[in-house]
Amino acid sequence: MKRDLLLTKIEEYKNIMPWYVLDYYQSKLSVPYSFTTLYEYLKEYKRFFEWLIDSDLSKAARIADVDLTTLEHLSKKDMEAFILYLRERPSLNTYSTKKGVSQTTINRTLSALSSLYKYLTEEVENEHGEPYFYRNVMKKVATKKKRETLAARAENIKQKLFLGDETMAFLDYVDKEYEYKLSNRAKASFRKNKERDLAIIALLLASGIRLSEAVNLDLKDVNLNMMLVEVTRKGGKRDSVNVAAFAKPHLEAYLSVRKDRYQAEKQDVAFFLTAYRGLPNRIDASSIEKMVGKYSESFKIRVTPHKLRHTLATRLYDTTKSQVLVSHQLGHASTQVTDLYTHIVNDEQKNALDKL
């Protein structure tokens, strides 16, 4: 979704929310949570508050009037009824045969509510320095995780990674072959953004930074002499991230055309730009997602920018066999989340079976 449209929709949701949700929004904006995350959370709150009113658990006539005491006194049974409602409600998609929403959607809803309840019961302060209330019913609500071993997840992800020579082959394909599949009109559009698109893909493959981190890069954050980028990690922490050398020529090529191609002025500090009605703007996440999907589908298989992050992490672990190094590169506080990459590159088990 374009940034302007995203912000417009966020304002629409804010206009119907209770005051304490607006407090929550302002607090999380300072962390900072991404606008995309906050938008998704506001959607979940709207659905939850509508259910509270429809179920007579709140006497409010509109969402903005749902008071804090309603949330404070909801029971575990009430929350389980909401989960059952999500699981059993008719799908909003006319063409779907599913009866309710997916478990992934339910987990996202519960995550949003857990975040709100934690804010209201632990993080916020009233005039007396106390939270608005203390009873957090979400701590009693169990979530159902997707049943899948690391090995199974690794095998599924592996098919969507550009490992080994495929990393450079993908870049070469976009650089030298992709345009020959296009019409003359499409070629003109491709050539206009070719250097930028290659720079984005190369940076993601060479650093493993998140999509949001790439979008929010400013010119001052990129040091091509040291091959470092400064990013804002989850939780608002600043971090210096090393970038593999193979990205340098693509980043340099983009910088050489950035000013003239996108009519960039001194005040246009965003590193990656797009032209909208002749004016330079920071590129948004949805544009990068579509761009990566388009090129990767033409090359091999449609993937997301996050799979390019997985690609870097897997290649780095395959080379170093160090989960600590990989976790530092990705900006993770522990090595637990990097266990996945050990399974992707772990051929020892297969080799042992072959010898039986």
Curated annotation (Swiss-Prot):
Residues of the Core-binding (CB) domain: 16-121
Localization annotation: Cytoplasm
Residues annotated as domain Tyr recombinase: 169-354
Keywords: Cell cycle, Cell division, Chromosome partition, Cytoplasm, DNA integration, DNA recombination, DNA-binding
Record-linked PROSITE patterns: CB, TYR_RECOMBINASE
Role description: Site-specific tyrosine recombinase, which acts by catalyzing the cutting and rejoining of the recombining DNA molecules. Essential to convert dimers of the bacterial chromosome into monomers to permit their segregation at cell division.
GO cellular component: cytoplasm
Entry protein name: Tyrosine recombinase XerS
Modes of activity regulation: FtsK is required for recombination.
Organism, as annotated: Streptococcus equi subsp. zooepidemicus (strain MGCS10565)
Record gene name: xerS
Record Pfam families: Phage_int_SAM_1, Phage_integrase
Entry's Gene Ontology BP terms: cell division; chromosome segregation; DNA recombination
